[in-house]
Amino acid sequence: MDTLRVEVVTLFPEMFSAITEYGITSRAVKQGLLQVTCWNPRDYTTDRHHTVDDRPFGGGPGMVMKIKPLEDALASARQATGAAAKVIYLSPQGRKLTQQAVKGLAEQESLILIAGRYEGIDERFIEAHVDEEWSIGDYVLSGGELPAMVLIDAVTRLLPGALGHVDSAEEDSFTDGLLDCPHYTRPEVYADQRVPDVLLSGNHAHIRRWRMKQSLGRTFERRADLLESRSLSGEEKKLLEEYLRERDDS
């Protein structure tokens, strides 16, 4: 009997008792079909306050999760489950989690889920370590734990022996909107990767323009359907064209 191993990087591991102690997923754990292990980035900090977040470069509200505690927690998860495990970040910027996508994930031997908090996680962690980003809808939650539990629940239902049949319920559609821009926090340089200069400039007008351009570009590349019902202003069209020119020239 195969066991799906799910490693979760989260600041709130106790939340996942909802998966391991209740319902179909709990039964799957008891049957040996599912194993869920949590890794808390706070356990990998070195300061007395166990700091896992910092202010975003370029200003703005909220905090951004720091890269080093995330990397160290991920390293432990990889060691436990194997380097081949797919790393998934639960994010409103990700692709829509459909039943077809869940079927593919259910075929994996192991998964590593990253549950963010605050304004998100340092973009450099995503670029370096995340294989896929998945979203459960175009709405705001306090963190990635609930989406991670949704994914685990949906995948578990497709494991042979967990249900006795496959649930093929349809997923709800997204509402319209733009995806978020990249976020960065300290350090300014990590593994030879620099934060974009505009975010260090202190010029708030330039920062706002850069963020809107990145948001438009990401939406065009990842969720072009969201732009179909959105009327872009002249400035937004100009920014999107500029983004595409810069992308093609790079």
Swiss-Prot record:
EC class of the enzyme, as a word: transferase
Cellular localization per UniProt: Cytoplasm
Cytoplasm recorded as keyword: yes
Main location: cytoplasm
Catalytic activity field: guanosine(37) in tRNA + S-adenosyl-L-methionine = N(1)-methylguanosine(37) in tRNA + S-adenosyl-L-homocysteine + H(+)
GO CC annotations, alphabetized: cytosol
Binding sites annotated in the UniProt record for S-adenosyl-L-methionine: 116, 136-141
EC number annotated for this UniProt entry: 2.1.1.228
Source organism superkingdom: Bacteria
InterPro entries, A to Z: Alpha/beta_knot_MTases, tRNA_m1G_MeTrfase_C_sf, tRNA_m1G_MeTrfase_TrmD, tRNA_m1G_MTases_N, tRNA_MeTrfase_TRMD/TRM10
Keywords: Cytoplasm, Methyltransferase, S-adenosyl-L-methionine, Transferase, tRNA processing
GO MF term set: tRNA (guanine(37)-N1)-methyltransferase activity
Family, similarity comment: Belongs to the RNA methyltransferase TrmD family.
Subunit structure: Homodimer.
PANTHER family xref list: TRNA (GUANINE-N(1)-)-METHYLTRANSFERASE
Function comment: Specifically methylates guanosine-37 in various tRNAs.
Protein name: tRNA (guanine-N(1)-)-methyltransferase
Organism name: Pseudomonas entomophila (strain L48)
